[in-house]
Amino acid sequence: MKAAEIREKFLKFFESKGHTIVRSSSLVPGNDPTLMFTNSGMVQFKDVFLGTDRRPYTRATTAQRSVRAGGKHNDLENVGYTARHHTFFEMLGNFSFGDYFKHDAIRFAWELLTTVYMLPKDKLWVTVYQEDDEAYDIWAKEVGVPTERIIRIGDNKGARYASDNFWTMGDTGPCGPCTEIFYDHGPEVWGGPPGSPEEDGDRYIEIWNLVFMQFNRDAQGNMTRLPKPCVDTGMGLERLAAVLQHVHSNYEIDLFQNLIKAAARVTEVSDLNNNSLKVIADHIRACAFLIVDGVIPGNEGRGYVLRRIVRRAIRHGYKLGRKGAFFHKLVADLVAEMGAAYPELKEAEQRVTDVLRQEEERFFETIEHGMSILESALADLEAKGGKVLDGELAFKLHDTYGFPLDLTADVCRERGVTVDEPAFDDAMARQREQARAAGKFKAAQGLEYTGAKTTFHGYEEIAFDDAKVVALYVDGSAVTEVKAGQDAVVVLDHTPFYAESGGQVGDQGVLANASTRFAVADTLKVQADVIGHHGTLEQGTLKVGDVLRAEIDAQRRARTQRNHSATHLMHKALREVLGSHVQQKGSLVDADKTRFDFAHNAPLTDDEIRRVEQIVNDEILANAPGIVRVMPYDEAVKGGAMALFGEKYGDEVRVLDLGFSRELCGGTHVSRTGDIGLFKIVMEGGVAAGIRRVEAITGDNAVRYVQELDARVNEAAAALKAQPAELTQRIAQVQDQVKSLEKELAALKSKLASSQGDELAQQAVEVGGVHVLAATLDGADAKTLRETVDKLKDKLKSAAIVLAAVEGGKVSLIAGVTAEASKKVKAGELVNFVAQQVGGKGGGRPDMAQAGGTEPANLPAALAGVKGWVEARL
């Protein structure tokens, strides 16, 4: 039974038992930013189990795409070397949300395994929690499993309820016993039953885990029964397929065998048992599906995990002799295997291929040099009998050549060497500290402040009348007063000034009273809730305790707000036009523009840019209100607010609904979308592999831009004697005319060259039976020079010729040597002789070569020396 059929039978079986088939959720958990990747079937139902979400069904079944390759769930180093470790796997599961419980869950599992999949009953063993008499009795008395094949597992992990057969969601919350089903491969395979000293052998393989959530554990460890207990089960598709296909390694199942054969094809390797092929076959699944779900290779978070997996696959291809990109070629094979079950993979095939190819090409630029350094270091280490690689070297490979630490550790492990990881960590920490020190911004960074928090009024007000000075800083040190002309940082107890945060620049404005005026050039955070006003005291003396009117530059704030609100609309529009993989990677919002970096692997087309602009401007015309609400983080995310992975959020967050956009945001925004006025994209480009940048303008800036563009169009139309609407047609006509004139000019040059050729032939000097000619051909281009040389070679029969032309301060050179003469005089050497004297170089075939130079003043002397140079070689 093939893996695809096993998956299909599982889902159909539970559908027949009243379960709703729920499609696999994304590998990027939408409801849990603390989790790197979806690693089990229950992740998408976590809020249902916690009671904070309700679904229109009480029974569900899924085939969930899962990844374990980061954080605590990290199987990366074992992948390819063991029978059952994978970065990507499919978890088959059935779930009950307060509907059925142990009796039905156990009966369903037994029926599916023994009736649908036809597994022999006498091959199945089960474990239950030591105290779960109910599950034990169901297996023994209702299902009929012999008691000698039912094993009770107690608290075997050193604490109460710490057991292989007791599941917990965390320190508190839903928990309960579980029962596991094992398949016995028979006595010919080493290993003992669960709970025995030999349980780590391969004879008894766990295939299904049924979790019974029946308790809630509080902070004191007290257990209370849940009013509606739930069921969460998980069975690895790959493990089940290995059992049903009578093989002992997951890599021997049909799905993996097909991918291993594809990996062998693209790496040109014949040994299908090579572990590197297993690594590559496993990694293409994880990489492809992560990219499908919007993850792009990068240097942090999920993007870095993806980069590590890609580069590990590339390293194994390199180990097999591949010196160029190969990994991306497996995407089509993966689509053939899994595209029917997961249509999103087929839809994203080209994007996945492009992202992987770009990442490969980038790494292949450095892998050879990096591997050479690593191999040399390992050879030196082995010669000295050492077993630990210097952590500083591992960091150099990481920092300079893009080698993730686990890739270096992988190579070392194959040679029986470990990496000094503490030294690596120290080097990494030093670099981060240097970066942090270099990134300290102006005077507000690193100030020692122990006072009260600043109360921010800037969401509602542009001025605050009774702001009290609570701290002053000059050159990073606290002072009690500031004199006119000094730069300083002012901390107030209340302020309307927005401090730079979330990509939005800080406010500018004025702090003043009757005798004092302080010009604020920038506003930034001294601490999380303490705002510093950086600027210059223009008048008077400013002291701690003074009371000031704090007023922002309202016009600058308004322009900044327009750009910030437009950024939210643009983010949403980009996701609609390009796909849900678009994720913000950085932004800068100021009064002039918005700059937005996002994950996408290809330049935006003109049509895509127009569609984004149209969507945003439609939202502006709708004049929808901006609605701000403060709510618990979990509630905001559950309500669809976009949270950025890697951002730190408090328990309470600010949610902005603006038109069709909903995001978590602490910035300042327009009251209605119509306040943005007009939105125009003015730049699109790439900033890194898989990262694009868009710059856009709004409001009066956008109006001026369009007006200036219109003026330039009118000027161009006038110059071409056409109406603006006819400009494209008129330009096409002019281009046709230019092409026609260029053809005429080329014909004239050819004709001129032909006529000059006759004259030049008469200037040739015979040296040892070879006609030598070195001359300048005025007004000739490279093509004309070549044609003239060819004609002279035909005319002179035995010749060595150099022709030159000068245009725009640059020298063009062509050398031609006839077949007989080229036995002694090479055109490439001849042209280089002249080129070196005019500040250039060149090369070519023995009979024809070309060169260029930048010193035309030296050309006459260089040509004059050709005769002697040829004569010396005859």
From Swiss-Prot:
Listed cofactors: Zn(2+)
Gene Ontology cellular component annotations, sorted alphabetically: cytosol
Note describing how the cofactor binds: Binds 1 zinc ion per subunit.
Top-tier EC class: ligase
Signal sequence segment: none
Record-annotated disulphide pairs: none
Enzyme Commission designation: 6.1.1.7
Subcellular location field: Cytoplasm
Catalytic reaction list: tRNA(Ala) + L-alanine + ATP = L-alanyl-tRNA(Ala) + AMP + diphosphate
Keywords: Aminoacyl-tRNA synthetase, ATP-binding, Cytoplasm, Ligase, Metal-binding, Nucleotide-binding, Protein biosynthesis, RNA-binding, tRNA-binding, Zinc
Pfam families: DHHA1 (PF02272), tRNA-synt_2c (PF01411), tRNA_SAD (PF07973)
Residues holding Zn(2+): 564, 568, 665, 669
GO biological process: alanyl-tRNA aminoacylation; negative regulation of DNA-templated transcription
Chief location: cytoplasm
GO-annotated molecular function: alanine-tRNA ligase activity; aminoacyl-tRNA deacylase activity; ATP binding; tRNA binding; zinc ion binding
HAMAP family tied to this protein: Ala_tRNA_synth_B
Free-text comment on this protein's domains from its UniProt entry: Consists of three domains; the N-terminal catalytic domain, the editing domain and the C-terminal C-Ala domain. The editing domain removes incorrectly charged amino acids, while the C-Ala domain, along with tRNA(Ala), serves as a bridge to cooperatively bring together the editing and aminoacylation centers thus stimulating deacylation of misacylated tRNAs.
Family membership: Belongs to the class-II aminoacyl-tRNA synthetase family.
Protein name, UniProt field: Alanine--tRNA ligase
Organism, as annotated: Burkholderia multivorans (strain ATCC 17616 / 249)
Classification lineage: Bacteria, Pseudomonadati, Pseudomonadota, Betaproteobacteria, Burkholderiales
